[in-house]
């Protein structure tokens, strides 16, 4: 069952895709994580919505620097409201 996107999720995803297509190739591969920070941001926004997903993406981007080892860092699963 496909989940529908809000207009804000659609816009945020398109902006990140624009970065991936036009800016990232110029900068070259620098992300220390798997999935890359931009793919992580898209997945987080799709799963958690624009506000919470952007928060996860911002925290991830702040960790992406030469002093952090990087590695596999998937998007946290969405918590069920009944099981908090």
Swiss-Prot record:
It is found in: Cell inner membrane. GO terms for cellular component: plasma membrane. SMART domains: Haemolytic. Keywords: Cell inner membrane, Cell membrane, Membrane. Its main location: membrane. It is a peripheral membrane protein. InterPro entries: Membr_insert_effic_factor_YidD. Could be involved in insertion of integral membrane proteins into the membrane. Belongs to the UPF0161 family. This is Putative membrane protein insertion efficiency factor. It comes from Shewanella amazonensis (strain ATCC BAA-1098 / SB2B).
